[in-house]
Amino acid sequence: SLFFKQDKSHFSQDGHKLVSNFLENKIKKLKIIIKDKKIKKSKTKRKKTKSKHTYILGISAFYHDSAATLIKDGEIIAAAQEERFSRQKNDRRFPVSAINYCLEKGNIQQEDLAGIAYYDNTYLTLERMLWSFAKTAPNSEKAWCHTMPSWVKYKLFIPKLIREKLKYNGKIFQNFHHRSHLASAFFASPYKKAAILTVDGVGEWATASIGIGNGNKIKMLKEMNFPDSIGLLYSAFTQFTGFKVNSGEYKMMGLAPY
C-alpha cells in the first residue's frame, strides 16, 4: 500500500496513511492505466574523484521544464534543461540527460555530492490540490483523473525516486517552492543584502512572497496564498487568448507592447 512521511507537515503520521489509502482506493475505482515510459537510470562515465570541494545537485522535475544544476562551493558550474537533450518542448520527465551533463561538466560522480536538493515540498502541494479538488467537485473530476496518476507514481516519492535513479545514498533536501524562487534570485545576484519579491502561479500554497536576503541566509517575511494568485490570473488570460498555459505566457509578454 502507498505510504509517505514528512517531518514537518500539516498532517500527522496517521493523516499521511489516510491520504495514501484514499488516493489508492480512488485510483483503483477510476481504473486508470498509466502508460508513462520507464525512466532510465542516470549514469556518468567519469571516474570518482577525491575532491575536497562541496558539490550540490539541484533537480526540478514532473511539472514543466525539468532541469538540473550543479553548484560547486556555492557557485553554479553547470545547469541545463532536459528539453535541450530530448528535443521535447517543456519536457517534464525526470532530467536524466541534464543530470548527466552536470555531473560530467563537474567531472564527478553521484557519490561525490554533498547533497541533492529538490525545488518543491510535494506533500504540501498535494494537500493544497486535494483541498482544491474537494472545493470544486464534481467539476474537478476530469482534472483529478488527469493529475493523480503522476502523483501516485512519482511525486509522492521524490527522495526514493532520486535514490533509485541515481543510485545515491547521501542527503536529499526538499525545499519550499517559494524559498527556491527567493534563493535563485538572491544568491545569483551581486548583492550581500536585499529585499526579494517572487510572484508565480502557485507553489505548495504560496502564490507570491517577499523576504530579505542577508549573506547566506534568507528570511521569509510575508506570503500570499492560494487561491489568490496574480500568476494564475496571468495564466487565465494566456489561455483566453489561445496560448498554452505554463508555456505561452512569454507570448503574452510579447503582445504587451502592442
Predicted features and spans:
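Short acidic/glycine-rich loops and adjacent helix/strand connectors
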Residues: 43-258
